[in-house]
């Protein structure tokens, strides 16, 4: 038997070496050809061989364990087994998830390794408005395109990109997506291994293994953090490592000082972790005073890096990205204004109990974490966890107050992912109770099983669990977050059940029998609609399957999927516009009905159109071709609101719109000088303030030039406007009562002809086109060769810091209120 094990071990070792060599070559080249065979190996795919390599490594470890080697499979030294097992599970779906939030972290390692900087200038596709109409994930600073998110995750991903950065791999290949996935999965798997080591110092091996499994597979660690380079993975690893150091520091005091490094890294990766770091730092100060200096010194390099990054990127060492700048708005914004306006009980109910985002719905085993949190406060309870508990509560309350508490388009309670290792550690005080009570033990195991299943749906069930966010964009229709019949947990199991029924009854389907498809529609929409250019049409359509074939919600290569679609017609001709789609959540059997909700954007050119809405069998036919008449609506698209040419026309317009004049936002547009030469950088300042009430508005900017020609700013250039008159400047802007906000833009003038120009700005109510304020300013573009005095370029961000002034006697207002995905 020993000889057989040795032979098997040798074969596995040889296989591992070959696979490792194969992976390294792919990472350097993006794929390679085998001479003589005429085939290409790899082809920008690296996940599959890595998955096999990990499986082989686990098999070798198991063979050594069975052969009686001195390696215990799930003993404390076997944290490597925990790491490899988690990594294998995270990669097993073989998929990459697209999210704009993670795009900077995907490409930053290439920029750091190839160019030695932190900008994204060399990736112009990230700035392409055709690919990314809303570029919330980047910003422009000091003349460069930079990430709008902390760079901690990108720094941890650097080792995975080294071969590709040194090799010939292009940025726009699938291999780079897979490198992001591999890095994210490895980071979270490491956090699971570190958590296991921490728990082994506190409880038994079996309890440590069960709690680690709950953390690794029953939280967003499986469904999100391990699938792409969000900030959460780096945050989880940093917090897990800090807790390990602090726990080990009880027996070996110098380990307490080491906690400063991972804790500081967690903060720069996810600045909200400061709410946990502060009480943990207080624990060190009070109970480990001799380690305070070492604790601070350990975190000093990370803090110094962040200050350097802020200074070189934004021109100010204390100018930070995204979330930390948003948290400063908590004390800046008065009640009822800005991004921290959700009533705390409403937000708390959402982050804990929402069918689409609730922590207790997707990871209900954390109820035992809450019990552990109570137990540590009794006499003799764990002193370290007493300090961690307020940080957990603070972060939950923080996100409960955010207006976007559901975290945009995501799966489950993504915003609370950072708390996962801390919540897992709070279970260990409950272990003695679980050991004594079989009922509680079974309840805990059942809740862990539910949690694993819930997050496995997000990780393994194709894209359908994610597509739920986009059918009716959840950011615009947050009421969908409270549906118990249509959510990311219910739809995939329902679809699986219906597919089982289809197989058992041998029903024809939309894929193999499209000739049997038929439907009846119902809609409460009027026969004719008038809508302004740029607005969206909300449509609810009920569809009943009156045919003999089942409608499929998933199918290989999408062929045979039944979806709701629409087409636009003008003068009897179909327009070359992208046909919209709304997806089914689950298969629909004959006799069943499904309610579709669609958000439809009309053509941008004003005029009369016909909108045709109906079901289609993807890649096969529209139902209308089989005799099911579609819903037809006559849609009149009007012009976007037109700004009055004269400023004195504004009060009359406001009066007609029934907006109280004394509550109208004050608005001004100004340029840094009145005359420019072609090629100069034009600086436009937009100043808004509110008095009497708070506003949340959309801003629209338009440049009128010589001969009445109109231009607009697309985020990078001033370009000629061909269709819609007004274009949005920002997704949403908050104007709190009594506050003033300034936005400064640097605009190139190279594309503009010589002549006189007028900038027009208007503010409208969010999700509507009712104008509430308007302003204008003029400038001259001259070809004169004489010098034109004035500002000639620089950093928008730095200028914001110096010029974001407030009304006299009023508190400072936050500079951003972007309500996009975070």
Can you annotate each of these PLM segments?
Residues 179-203, 241-244:
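Transmembrane-helix motifs of polytopic, lipid-linked glycan transferases
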Residues 109, 211-213, 242-245, 255-270, ...:
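Membrane-interface alpha helices of multi-pass inner-membrane proteins
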Residues 167-174, 192-218, 237, 250-258:
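Transmembrane-helix signature of polytopic, membrane-embedded enzymes
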Residues 2-3, 281-285, 361-383, 389, ...:
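Hydrophobic, aromatic-rich transmembrane alpha-helices
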Residues 1-18, 48-91, 200, 294-297, ...:
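Start-transfer (signal-anchor) and selected internal transmembrane alpha helices
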Residues 73-83, 296-304, 384-393, 431-460:
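Signature aromatic-anchored transmembrane alpha helix within multi-pass, membrane-resident enzymes
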Residues 275-308, 370-381:
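Perimembrane helix-loop-helix junctions
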Residues 194, 234-263, 422-426:
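Specific aromatic-rich, kink-prone transmembrane helix
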């Amino acid at each position: 038997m020993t000889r057989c094990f040795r032979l098997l071990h040798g074969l596995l070792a040889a296989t591992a070496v070959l696979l490792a060599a194969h992976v390294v070559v792919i990472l350097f080249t993006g794929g390679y050809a085998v001479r003589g065979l005429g085939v290409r190996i790899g082809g920008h795919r690296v996940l599959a061989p890595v998955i096999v390599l990990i499986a082989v490594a686990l098999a070798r470890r198991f063979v050594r364990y069975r052969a009686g080697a001195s390696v215990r499979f799930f003993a404390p030294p076997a944290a490597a087994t925990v790491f490899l097992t988690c990594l294998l599970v995270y990669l097993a779906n073989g998929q990459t998830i697209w999210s704009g939030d993670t795009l900077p972290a995907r490409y930053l390692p290439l920029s750091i390794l190839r160019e030695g900087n932190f900008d994204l200038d060399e990736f112009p596709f990230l700035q392409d408005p055709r690919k990314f109409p809303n570029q919330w994930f980047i910003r422009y600073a000091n003349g460069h395109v930079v990430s709008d998110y902390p760079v901690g995750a990108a720094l941890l991903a650097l080792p995975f990109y080294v071969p590709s950065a040194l090799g010939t791999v292009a940025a726009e290949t699938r291999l780079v997506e897979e490198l992001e996935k591999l890095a994210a999965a490895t980071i979270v798997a490491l956090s699971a291994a570190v958590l296991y080591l921490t728990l082994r110092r506190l409880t038994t091996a079996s309890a440590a293994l069960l709690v680690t499994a709950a953390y690794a597979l029953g939280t967003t660690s499986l469904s999100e953090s391990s699938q792409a380079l969000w900030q959460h993975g780096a945050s989880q690893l940093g917090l897990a490592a800090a807790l390990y150091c602090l726990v080990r520091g009880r027996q070996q005091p110098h380990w307490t000082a080491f906690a400063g490094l991972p804790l500081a890294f967690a903060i720069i990766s996810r600045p909200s972790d400061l709410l946990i770091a502060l009480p943990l730092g207080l624990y060190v100060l009070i109970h480990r005073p001799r380690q305070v200096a070492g604790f601070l010194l350990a975190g000093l390099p990370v803090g110094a890096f962040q200050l350097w990054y802020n200074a070189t990127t934004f021109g100010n060492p204390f100018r930070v990205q995204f979330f930390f700048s948003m948290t400063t708005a908590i004390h800046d914004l008065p009640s009822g204004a800005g991004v921290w306006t959700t009533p705390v009980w409403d937000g708390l109910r959402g982050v804990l109990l929402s069918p689409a985002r609730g922590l207790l719905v997707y990871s209900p085993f954390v109820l035992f974490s809450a019990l552990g949190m109570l137990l540590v406060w009794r006499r003799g309870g764990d002193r370290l966890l007493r300090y961690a508990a307020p940080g957990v509560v603070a972060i939950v309350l923080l996100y409960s107050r955010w207006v976007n508490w559901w975290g945009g388009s995501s799966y489950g309670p993504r915003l609370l992912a950072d708390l996962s290792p801390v919540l897992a550690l709070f279970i260990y005080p409950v272990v003695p109770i679980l050991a004594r009570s079989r009922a509680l033990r079974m309840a805990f195991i059942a809740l862990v099983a539910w949690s694993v299943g819930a997050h496995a749906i997000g990780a393994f069930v194709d894209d359908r669990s994610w597509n739920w966010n986009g059918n009716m964009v959840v950011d615009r229709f947050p009421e969908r977050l409270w549906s118990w019949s249509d959510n990311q947990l219910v739809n995939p199991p329902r679809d699986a059940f219906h597919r089982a029924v289809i197989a058992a009854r041998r029903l024809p389907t939309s894929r193999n029998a499209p000739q049997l498809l038929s439907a009846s529609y119902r809609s409460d929409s009027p026969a004719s609609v008038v809508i302004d250019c740029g607005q969206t049409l909300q449509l609810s359509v009920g569809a009943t399957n009156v045919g003999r074939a089942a409608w499929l919600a998933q199918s290989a290569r999408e062929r045979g999927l039944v979806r709701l679609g629409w087409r636009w017609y003008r003068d009897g001709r179909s327009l070359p516009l992208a046909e919209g789609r709304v997806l089914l959540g689950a298969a629909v059997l004959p006799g069943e009905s499904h309610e579709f909700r669609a958000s439809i954007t009309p053509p941008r050119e004003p005029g009369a159109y016909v909108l045709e809405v109906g079901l289609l069998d993807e890649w096969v036919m529209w139902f209308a071709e089989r005799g099911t008449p579609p819903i037809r609506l006559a849609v009149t698209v009007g012009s976007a609101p037109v700004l009055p040419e004269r400023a004195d026309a504004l009060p009359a317009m406001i009066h007609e719109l029934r907006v109280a004049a004394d509550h109208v936002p004050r608005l001004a547009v100004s340029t840094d000088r009145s005359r420019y030469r072609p090629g100069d950088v034009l600086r436009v300042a937009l100043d808004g303030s509110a008095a009497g009430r708070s506003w949340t508005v959309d801003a629209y900017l338009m440049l009128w030039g010589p001969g009445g020609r109109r231009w607009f700013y697309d985020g990078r250039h001033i370009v000629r406007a061909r269709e819609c008159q007004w274009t949005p400047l920002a997704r949403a802007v908050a104007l709190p009562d009594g506050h003033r906000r300034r936005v400064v833009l640097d605009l190139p003038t190279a594309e503009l002809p010589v002549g006189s120009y007028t900038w027009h700005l208007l503010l409208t109510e969010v999700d509507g086109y009712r104008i509430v304020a308007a302003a204008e300013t003029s400038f001259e573009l001259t070809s004169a060769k004489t010098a034109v005095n004035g500002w000639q370029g620089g950093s928008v961000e730095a200028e914001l810091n110096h010029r974001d002034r407030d009304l006299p006697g009023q508190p400072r207002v936050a500079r951003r209120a972007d309500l996009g995905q975070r």
